[in-house]
Amino acid sequence: MKLDITTLDGGSAGSVELNEAIYGLEPRADILQRMVRYQLAKRRAGTHAVKNRSDVDRTSKKLYKQKGTGNARHGAASAPQFRGGGRAFGPVVRDHSHDLPKKVRALALKHALSAKAKASTLIVVDDIKVDNHKTKAMIERFEKLGLSSALIIGGSEVDENFGRAARAIPKIDVLPVQGINVYDILRRDTLVLTRAAVDALEERFK
C-alpha cells in the first residue's frame, strides 16, 4: 500500500510503502471492542467504597426486646433498612482490570491502523519539528491539512515546540510512538503518523 507523504505546511515529500500486514487488514469490530474495554477497565481507579453495617457509627445494641412489644423483630440499628444504617452489597475497592492475550492486543493495534487506512483517514507526514511553539501558527498548519480531530504520533520523542503548540488545541492529541494505542486512535477522526513512527511500527511488528 503506497501513501503520499506530506509536510506540516501541506507540501509533498514523496511517498511511503505501508506494510499490508499492518495497514491492509480487514478491520474486526469485535477485536477492537475487546481492546477498548481492556484499556478502559485498566485505567479505572477502583477506589469506590461505601460503609457497610460494620463501618457505620451506630450502636450494636438490640433496639428492643425480641418479644412482647408488638413490633417487628430487629437487632442493631446499623442494619441496612434503617436511616443511618450500613449499605448492603455496596461497591468495594477493587481492581477492574482483566487479562487480554498479548497477541490479541497486538492484533487490535493492527486492526485500528488498518481501519484508519481503509477509511482514508491516515496521513503520513515527514516530520513534526517546528521552530516555535505558537499555537496560532499550528492551527493554521492543521487547517491546511484539514485536521480538526486528530491523533498525531511522533517518533521516540515528540518535538518540544510542537507538543507545546498543539496541546492547547481541542481534539488534537500528540503521543510518541511508544504511546500509540487503540483507544486514542479510534476516538479521533484522523491518524497522523510521522515517517519515524511508520518505521518504528514496522520494526515493532516484525
Curated annotation (Swiss-Prot):
Similarity comment: family membership: Belongs to the universal ribosomal protein uL4 family.
Source organism per UniProt: Methylorubrum extorquens (strain PA1)
Q: Its function? A: One of the primary rRNA binding proteins, this protein initially binds near the 5'-end of the 23S rRNA. It is important during the early stages of 50S assembly. It makes multiple contacts with different domains of the 23S rRNA in the assembled 50S subunit and ribosome. Forms part of the polypeptide exit tunnel.
| Protein name as it appears in the record | Large ribosomal subunit protein uL4
Q: Give the highest taxon in the source lineage.
A: Bacteria
Q: Which gene encodes it?
A: rplD
Query: What HAMAP family does its record include?
Result: Ribosomal_uL4_B
Respond yes or no to whether keyword NAD is given for this record. Answer: no
**One Gene Ontology cellular component annotation?**
ribosome
InterPro entries in alphabetical order = Ribosomal_uL4, Ribosomal_uL4-like, Ribosomal_uL4_dom_sf
